[in-house]
Amino acid sequence: MRVFVTGASGWIGSAVVPELIRAGHDVVGLARSDGAAEAIAARGAEVLRGDLNDLDVLRTGAADSDGVIHLAFVVPSVSEAATRADAEAIDTFAAALADSGKPLVVSGGTLSTPGRVTTERDELVAAGPIAARITNMKAALASADRGVRSILVMLPRSVHGAGERHGFIPQLIAVARAKGVSGYIGDGSTRWPAVDVKDAATLYRLALEKAPAGAVLNAVGDEGVAVRDIAEAIGRHLNVPARSLPAEEFEGMLVRLLSTDMPASSAITQHLLGWTPTHPGLIEDIDEGHYFS
């Protein structure tokens, strides 16, 4: 297949592109800068210059492909401008692929269902701080009604691996270095789902190749890792204590993420696609030490 990938030079794209190429697919990666173009080309993919605001470029990339994997997001925060650009990009892809039966694989985030482990069958409810993004996810799934094989890949809070520089684990390490304490909020019992980036890349490929229209897939290796265990693993490597800190010691999304229990299962996904995570879990990955070099 000829696959158009947005976010091809990003953290997840850097694993997805080689995974697709190894499986025999031809990849066209969207690049908004010279650096991104060089990174995409170095991985063996063709480059299409543009960004998520270039709808004509997105339309061309999708129309000339056998499927789209949408990994890009304009900025790392959930801003109105970013979610609007995401919505327009998804609509552009859906229109370009309409009535073709071709796959449109869109990224989301695993849900939080108080008191239990979330699954792929939980309803997408557009509420809370990421309501606009959930609306976009629902729009992507609805493109199945337009003859598109639309699929959601729901990513956990930690997509980890060697080379990660900007995710939540590097942020927690930076806080621990700055404060001399590896911290968590409360008793640290809240849990994060996690997946190795290479396992996530395999799931994106399987989704592209054989997931049915309307599928919601959880890219989860670790169902739930206690944030206290994460803090202790970081503390071991930095030789600092791990203990509870007031919420105000953390910034941005970390406060909500450290305070919210959000375990997630991928049992349905694994059964549907035959996907089995095989790479190290989050604590084992932290203990390998590459985050601290």
Report residues per predicted region.
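NAD(P)H-binding glycine-rich loop region in Rossmannoid oxidoreductase-like domains
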Residues: 29-91, 95
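Mid/C-terminal beta-alpha module of Rossmann-like enzyme folds, strongest
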Residues: 2, 182, 203-254
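Glycine/proline-rich active-site loop of Rossmann-fold NAD(P)-dependent oxidoreductases
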Residues: 134, 160-170, 178-179, 206-217, ...
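N-terminal Rossmann NAD(P)H-binding glycine-rich loop of SDR-like oxidoreductase domains
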Residues: 3-25
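Conserved beta-loop-beta element that borders a ligand/cofactor-binding pocket
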Residues: 138-162
